[in-house]
Amino acid sequence: MFDLILKNGLIVDPLNGTNEVGDLAVKEGKIEMIGHDLSNAKEIEDCQGKLVMPGLIDAHMHFGSVYGSKHGARMTALAGVTTCLDMAGPLDEVLKTTKRSGAGITFGIVDRYDPNSMHGTASPSDKQITDWTHSHTEGGALGVKLVGGHWPLDPATCHKVIELCNEENLYVAWHAGSTNNKS
């Protein structure tokens, strides 16, 4: 017996070349079978006129208040996204907001580094960069996002952050811009 059968949906699975109307059976959280006229399940859901496909991955989105919304996790889930990468944080806020939303999204955070507001300078010391990076990755961030396009950083700071992330095998993202080109 299956736990769930999704009946009569348009099943799309690019990896396996599936693009047809049919039934999809789930057992213990895993797809057990794709076919036609499947039955014998604890729950059967009619999906006629609907897509049945793997969850989408959004590699760049924002849950935090700086660029996003407290409703971001719910809105993202409603769009079919099951896995995403928040590219700005702030870490603590995103963790609280997504936990409260109950949307069930798997996500990671690459936290925004803005030394002007965090340290009062666009040219922080190596220790300031290292301490901030460690405190955020220990808190759950996967890496650092430089937001030079919004808050220009000097090239030396950008270099230090990228070098540190490389040494420590952390993600680094860069919203291009520096004090050299005033962007």
Describe each region flagged by the PLM:
Residues C47, S69-L153, T157, I162-L170:
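Divalent-metal coordination cores built from histidine and acidic residues
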Residues N181-S183:
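Catalytic core of soluble alpha/beta enzymes
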Residues G9, L24, G29, G49, ...:
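Divalent metal-coordination and catalytic microenvironments
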Residues M1-N40:
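N-terminal metal-binding scaffold of metallo-dependent hydrolase/deaminase domains
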Residues P14, C47, A59-M61, M87, ...:
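Generic detector of well-ordered alpha-helical packing
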Residues G55-V66, G148, V172-T179:
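Histidine-centered catalytic micro-motifs
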Residues D13-P14, M53, S117:
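Short, solvent-exposed loop/turn elements at domain surfaces
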